[in-house]
């Protein structure tokens, strides 16, 4: 056995430890010696002798068969192998150890499997080895079970073949055939692996190659993308939907993309892990960011305005294809001249026309009808006197009107700059031909579903009004012709098909199909297209227009001819012909076109009114106060005037009062008769049933008409004949009535216009202003303090003279025919004295002539403001006719002759002296050198009549102080006209005492204290 004749151990034998080999040697001692000898003899003959090998193999085979028939375990072969492994040298002992490990494992595995037939371990070991796998590893006891499972797996996969399936007689030939099969299997595996690699490369090239990219781009342009490109997996980066402000999506995507580029440039090789940023037009208020982690998105979006980072949503994987699926955009391509609407600002919702588009398609220049107030509502700072412009808001925005350079020049010249006759710059905005040209961002403009109205289209016409509203109305009518609707119960006629000419009743209807019950087919209703039906009406039916220019109009059907229905309009009283399908039956006979109807008085501006002579849905024909007939839109009407509550009146050529509802007749011309509809300034609107033109409405000046019947008498079916005879009116006195007097009536021009007024109602109470306009009972007042216009009831104002004076009410102003009280030039303290007696017994009588002016001078009286005379009972009536500067005497006959106050300058006449040189207005002037109560004597020195008495005893008394008239030794009683010192004498009691306390200029003045 030492000659190396032992069969070499296969490469797949495992190496076992010494403990297992010792156990194997113990098992080998129990084997039969015959087997060991036979095996050892075969080993000594050498491997080179084929005959010996064949004989040994045959002997072994016979022994194995004999042992298998007896049922004894085959352990002799194992013992022989153990002996041979011990005698081997040069590393053969390790190979035998590996064989023992393999035998141990197999035996241990076989002991567990009792159902399997036991075979010689050496032969089974040789046949179950894989010659093409080099499996050599050191294993431990813990990995024995895993090796057993791997071996069984190799057996199942065909890498190890069982010897029991082959004929045992083949021997080495069977092993060679097995080697050939294994080599062929390896070749097949190599070939299949190469084919798999080529096939995989082809698939990758088709999927990610350049040709596939071209196909993908072509498919994307066609709107179709294969589904395999849209299927993500859980390994792909997550996409988060982040909430943002609606309308800011595209702007935020550009902003975030720019931020990413800046961060990548600053960080160098460390790129930010943001893979993509996008938004979808179908999902407003969200942007989508693709990133591997949520924290990356939070840090990336931190500090960016208009992003609500706390409100983010993870998009599920199954919804990603729908999110990334391309859809056809519904955006309208903007072109010059197309109509759009503004989304924000004071022009929100206004129609605009595209004038220019920027090169980057991000901004657009629009042509808009401006909304300006020209600084009417600006406030002025009371300290700096600077104008504070108020920015108009959407709630208080002005009406759309073309730019008026005259108004801007008059009200806000500082902000106006003229470039040429057509181009102006006002508040840094350009106005050309009256239109505003302003740039807007594309996201602030609405481009879809723009349906301009007739009113809006009319504003974009030329300044001369070249827009043909009739043509626009006809185009709208044609567009609405397709909007035909049928209601259940409508009687219709079939126009096309086999049932042409049949008539039936609509059972139900949709936008395109109508179900009709025909008498010829009572069992089953038939369906017809809407275009094949026509409505049926009869004369006398009351119909209403549901589509077209006359939408909302109603009336009675007169005739029907070839599908055209003619009816009498309830609004215009004219015949209207319209297609039958644009009508529907109506039980309401009142016109319902809009809030305006025939003969309504409407306000077009602050000073212009008109009467509607033809009413439509959006277009009206009116006649203004000048008699001009024009066509306007509904938006041009500011408001409707309620004539039933109007108190406006005027007078005819005879001075008779005319009010709304009265009947008048023209004095000259066609002598047209009619009823007054409205009174405006110097014109009146009259409607006549005898005139067909302009719906019977005409405008006439009240000077050219006569009133023939008042409204009140018309209600009582009586004519007011008294107003037709001026002689009777002149003989008739003023009407007597116990009732309170009626409110004053207006005559001629409005008396309140241009008057200075003070507000008496709350809100602006006490503020001064000027009446700029009057419309009915309302007056437009321009306040002085705020440069602001307000509208207020004209009877809640107090009217003043421009120079001051007392205020009066509106009714007093009307009674005075617009004349205001004269303004005071200054305060007056003159009180006319009573007539004084000439003797000691003369008593200054009390004044009972209060109506004549008595004590207080009559400021602003109707007689020109003259000082009234003093009416005395005790001294005659010599002072009754005295005037302020006239020739009447001051004191009559007994007080000093015929001295005048200022008639002859006071040169020669004295107050009470006898030739004295001190006159009232002579050398000693009233206010020249002498003071008011100073050393100036009342008369010449030495006279008894108050010779030494001064006004204030030398003191400068005030107007209402406690100064006495004189300061004599008798107790202070002034002796104006007598020598008696008694207080009870008639001349001693001063008449100033009784009435002096009532003076308006000094309060409790004691001019005449006893």
Swiss-Prot record:
Tell me which Gene Ontology terms the entry assigns under biological process: intracellular mRNA localization; negative regulation of transcription elongation by RNA polymerase I; positive regulation of autophagy; positive regulation of transcription elongation by RNA polymerase I; positive regulation of transcription elongation by RNA polymerase II; regulation of rRNA processing; regulation of transcription-coupled nucleotide-excision repair; spliceosomal complex assembly
Q: What is its main location?
A: nucleus
Query: What segments bear the compositional bias annotation Gly residues?
Result: 895-906, 1001-1010
Question: Could you tell me which CDD domains the record lists for this protein?
Answer: KOW_Spt5_1, KOW_Spt5_2, KOW_Spt5_3, KOW_Spt5_4, KOW_Spt5_5, NGN_Euk
Q: Where is the composition biased (Acidic residues)?
A: 90-119, 135-152
| Regions of compositional bias (Low complexity) in chain numbering | 907-943, 977-988
Where composition is biased (Basic and acidic residues), the residues are 9-26, 55-70, 120-134
- Give the matching SUPFAM superfamilies: Translation proteins SH3-like domain
Q: Where is this region: Disordered?
A: 1-155, 160-179, 895-1010
Could you tell me the keywords of this UniProt record? mRNA processing, Nucleus, Repeat, Transcription
The Polar residues compositionally biased stretches are 28-44, 960-973
CC annotations in GO: DSIF complex; rDNA heterochromatin
Q: Transmembrane region positions? A: none
Recorded GO molecular functions are: chromatin-protein adaptor activity; DNA binding; histone binding; mRNA binding; RNA polymerase I core binding; RNA polymerase I general transcription initiation factor binding; RNA polymerase II complex binding; rRNA binding
Question: Where would I find the KOW domain in this sequence?
Answer: 333-360, 536-563, 750-777
Function field: The SPT4-SPT5 complex mediates both activation and inhibition of transcription elongation, and plays a role in pre-mRNA processing. This complex seems to be important for the stability of the RNA polymerase II elongation machinery on the chromatin template but not for the inherent ability of this machinery to translocate down the gene.
Name the protein family: Belongs to the SPT5 family.
Q: Oligomeric state and partners?
A: Component of the SPT4-SPT5 complex. Interacts with RNA polymerase II.
Identify this protein by name. Answer: Transcription elongation factor SPT5
